[in-house]
A protein has these predicted regions:
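Charged, often glycine-rich, active-site loop that binds/positions anionic groups
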Residues: 100-118, 264-280
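Secretory targeting and sorting signals
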Residues: 1-45
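Short amphipathic alpha-helices and their capping/turn segments at secondary-structure boundaries
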Residues: 40-51, 115-132, 185-200, 301-302
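Serine-esterase "nucleophile elbow" of acetyl-processing enzymes
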Residues: 45-99, 150-156
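Oxyanion-hole/transition-state-stabilizing segment in secreted/luminal serine hydrolases
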Residues: 63, 114-177, 208
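A structural motif corresponding to the C-terminal end of an alpha-helix
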Residues: 84-92, 183-200, 234-255
Length: 305
């Protein structure tokens, strides 16, 4: 298989600004026809068990999975929040937005120089009964990491060029970013409890992205063989941080990693729940597809009980 060009790898990675631009320019999935300009999509179950507010980034919103709403936030009608609300009888307020960081929980999120989503925490009320928070990946620069590692893989596909780049000088830059994000997640959780004191709060972790039992599938997924273990460990550390902050701040952690092992980006169509560089089903690159969102919903529903 011919090697992908660096420019192609960069253009196809998970920078959600790029995904949003594609959606805006091409009208992907008829966003306008599905209520694209709303600030927070609301879906009501027939028999409401209360109000559920979903906060988070693109792993919550489900970019490019039909049907889309929420404008440039790229929310799917079958993301895990929507599925959980329907299954458990909640009225859903989906405030999630592709590209969100912890800062966007309390601040406007902007793109193209315009506000695309108000502060996600503004969706909370004193009557909110369920809150999920899926955040942190963009704080550590997930999109930039994938883009950087894809480019580095072309220089040494059988080595570990990305690991070397992020650990130069003996300091693991990604681990440091995870540690720096922990207090931000804690602050968000405290604010959730302040605004919705009666709500059950769940922190949703990130699913398995890279294979556990191999060194990857370069060049189909352009991560150098020697970098797969490092990036997998980085995700493990991110999830561990989220679990720790949930436990320390009155929330329940939802493990979506364990139940998705074996459904990573290197698996064949129908088995993989995370899409690779070139998606084979409607979803953003390196993000859950509809099967992945369904698996995350199942994990969340199991945690809720």
């Amino acid at each position: 298989m011919p090697l992908p060009a660096v420019s192609f790898a960069r253009a196809s990675t998970v920078g959600l600004g790029r995904v949003r631009r594609a959606a805006a320019l091409g009208g992907i999935l008829a966003l306008a026809a599905t209520g694209a300009l709303t600030s927070a999509s609301v879906a009501s179950a027939a028999e409401s068990g209360g109000t559920y507010v979903a906060l988070g980034d693109s792993y919550t919103s489900g970019p490019l999975i039909p049907l889309q709403s929420g404008g440039l936030c790229l929310r799917s009608s079958v993301n895990y929040a929507s599925l959980t609300a329907a299954d458990l009888g909640y009225s859903l307020v989906d405030a999630s937005c592709a590209g969100a960081t912890t800062d966007n929980m309390a601040q406007d999120q902007t793109d193209f120089g315009s506000v695309i989503n108000p502060p996600e925490l503004d969706a909370l009320t004193g009557g909110t009964s369920l809150v999920t928070l899926g955040i942190g990946g963009n704080d550590i620069g997930f999109s930039d990491i994938i883009e950087t590692c894809a480019g580095e893989s072309l220089t040494d596909p059988f080595g570990d060029p990305c690991t070397a780049r992020y650990t130069v000088g003996g300091t693991d830059q990604l681990l440091a970013a995870i540690h720096a994000t922990g207090p931000k997640v804690a602050a968000v959780l405290r604010e959730i409890h302040q605004r919705s004191p009666h709500a059950a709060v769940y922190v949703v972790g990130y699913p398995d992205i890279l294979p556990e039992d191999s060194d990857g599938c370069w060049p189909i997924v352009p991560i150098a063989y020697g970098d797969v273990a490092y990036l997998r460990q980085t995700e493990t550390e991110l999830n561990a941080m989220l679990a720790g902050e949930a436990d320390a701040n009155g929330a329940t952690y939802v493990d979506t990693y364990t139940p998705t092992v074996g459904h990573d980006v290197c698996q064949p169509v129908g088995v993989k729940w995370i899409e690779g560089l070139i998606p084979t089903s409607p979803a953003a690159p390196f993000h859950p597809n509809a099967l992945g969102e369904a698996a995350m919903a199942k994990a969340l529903e199991s945690a809720i009980g």
